[in-house]
Amino acid sequence: MPVTRMTSSYANMKVGRWDISDLVKDPSSEEFSRFLRSIEEQLVQFEGSRQLLRPDISSEEFEGLIHMLESISEKVSITSGHAYLSYYADTSSNEASALVIKMEKLASEISNRMLFFDLWFKKQIDHENANRLINAIPKAYQEHLRHKRLVAKYSLSEPEEKIISTLEVTGIRALTKIYDKMTSGFEFTMKLRHGRKTIEKKFDNKEKLVSLVRSPDGNRREAAYKSLLQVYKRNSGVLGEIYQNIIMQWRDEAILMRGYRSPISVRNIANNLDDATVEALLAACRNNVSIFHDYFIEKSKMLGMKKLHRYHLYAPISNKASDSKKFTYGKAVETVLDSFGDFDPQFRGHAERVFAKHHIDSEIRKAKRGGAFCYSVTPKLTPYVLLNFDGISRDVSTLAHEFGHAIHSMLASDMPLMVFHAPLPLAETASVFAEMLLNEKMAEKMSKKERRILLAEQIDNLYATIIRQAYFTLFEINAHKAIGENNATIDAVSRIYMDNLKEQFGTSIIISPDFEWEWVYIPHFYHTPFYTYAYSFGNLLVLSLYKQYKLEGRSSFVPKYFKILSAGGSRKPEELLMEAGIDISRQEFWQQGFDYVQEMIQQLKALAP
């Protein structure tokens, strides 16, 4: 795709809503109905090709079926994308919610009707003819098709797969939708003490509240956490039961029906990673957690505290409000784009295209989905980015992070839809790298004191994206075992989570009892079990890549880096990274990332007054 370069200044840009009319202009229009009918027509044609599925099918016929399947899938992605983005923009909208249900049912029906092709290739064609077809098809598809054959042993019969696909709409998907609807409607009351008075402040968007856990004011940090955790604890009965049911359904399907080795193996195989690789990653995180214990002890000294409390984990190292810089949205955008441009003009140009297409929703408002994400619908369409921008420095980092995801998608836009998305372990390769570019740019004009503040923020972020995420996965392993095998109660799961926190922080931090309910606040546990280790993987990988970039320089590094990003999901992660000189099967590789973190902590200590 061509790179867009906007010439106007971004300094005066304001937060706003996205324009999703590139997907569907009006879901109630005749035009949209015609679009849905065109999907049905193609689907009937595809179903009629079933007679071609013989062992001796020609490679041309096979490739034609692949392209037909992709054409249908692309149209479904567009209709589903519009429904989801409408819903995320306003989760209280009954129309948007109804459209999501309609599109999910349609997608499930279409998936069921195309299932015969997938199952035929996985289980019914012999090994020799499968390899013949794989070797004859364009290279971009080959690893994906090999992986399909690899996971074939976990596939069930066509009728069984259809039943599972149909039940998902009213099963796990319905449960996560209830979780989203319930939690997005939460209202929070933060209580702040001023002398003998208690002042209450209401929040109807948890992102606004959560941003205060990084406030320079310790009372605000503590009050924000207490308000957040109190609401989730009050609703833990329902939220906990939703989680229990998700785990039982995950276990029933993955272990009892499909025969996976363990609950996490489902995610590992989907990521095209060996269990042993993930185990090595998690072991490295546990072995190096003391690095962050050292940091938390140092941070408590910088904050003038005897010992750091969990409420103050993300406290800025300066408690002066004047040191907590606020950014206008325009300045944040300008800074991020400049950092991208310093690295590579193409990197910046791709990010600018998101603004040119108005594919960003950045304002905070009631009923909008919290957090931030990048949604890539198809290779041909510019990705969509959702933010909840409140002007703190972390929001600027989030902006860079999500635009990194968008750039990753755009660099992979030459890949077919089937292999367009990077696998989870590589999904953070551009987003975290983009954050590091931003940090370097921001440090250029900083004083020693400001660099110290930025460095502490970076280490805080590395804790949050490496150790915290790895320990989330370790918690999930234990929670799935406890619920799946022993029918653990919600209180028992909370105790498992508290034990996890105690190992994670050791004696470096004081943990109050209310944090045992933090787990019901983590949406990844509900939406995508065992997802979070990919953040640990991605961040440690990027630390290695960034080190390589600084050693080699742009001219040598950029082509290799872009090759990784442009591959999308067309290559096995181990093989793709090996070409760049990175062997993720070696324990020493993961240690390099932690050594880099340790260097940063030493730099922080050296900057102390």
Give a label for each model feature:
Residues P2-A321, L607-P609:
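A well-structured
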Residues G259, D390-M410, S431, M436, ...:
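Active-site recognition of the HExxH zinc-binding catalytic motif
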Residues E298, M302-P345, V385, H408, ...:
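Long, K/E/R/D-enriched contiguous segments that form extended
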Residues S322-F327, D361-T382:
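Catalytic zinc-binding patch centered on the HExxH motif and its immediate surroundings
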Residues D338, D342-G349, Y375, H405, ...:
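Conserved helix-loop functional segments at active or binding sites
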Residues M418-A430, N461, I490, T528-Y535:
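Active-site metal-coordination segments of metallo-dependent hydrolases
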